[in-house]
């Protein structure tokens, strides 16, 4: 049986590495839908994958801002009509702008919630309302959602909500045979991490491909034995 996966935030970092793991290593995922904002990084990633993709596999890239709920819902509906059932969703797209409590701007707070919380919710709800039955939903949270950190109020709050939302999704969707896994990576060398900790040496922390390997395991045959509300991975 061939399967289709959808990965948000697929232009770089954990998202792009997850796409690569699915396309090149998965036993049964043959189609990967890639959502990301229009950027040179995303265009370069698309070209690289098209040049190296194995026979019988394909990518379906879409330029979409996960923080724009209306555009996101439309993109999800259109791609579902095009590719059919989406078996695996990896809600990876994220945003942060770390500032002290006194300097938090409400517009920026709302943007953080839009991308980090409403984005995953919109993807899942839109597909459910289109009749899609998932095998696996992976919501990427963060250890910052477990233990809030100074200066990371908006990001930590949004990721804490993702952890809780994942618990509810897990309970509600179990009747359909859907597994919902929330993954909370620790320090990972991504663009978002550089925003949170600009002075940190990225070579000393976990790499995106390490997290992607964990996600690949969730989607593999052995992954059906993994059913947890929140899994922490850290180096």
Where are these regions (language model features)?
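Substrate-binding pocket helix/loop in short-chain dehydrogenase/reductase
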Residues: 100-101, 108-110
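Conserved glycine-rich Rossmann-like NAD(P)H-binding loop of the short-chain dehydrogenase/reductase
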Residues: 27-44
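Alpha-helical segment proximal to the catalytic Tyr-Lys
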Residues: 129, 170-172
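C-terminal helical subdomain
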Residues: 175, 182-183, 190, 200-235
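Conserved glycine-rich cofactor-binding loop
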Residues: 11-12
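Active-site helix of classical SDR
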Residues: 124, 158
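Residue(s) in the substrate-gating loop at a strand-loop-helix junction
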Residues: 142
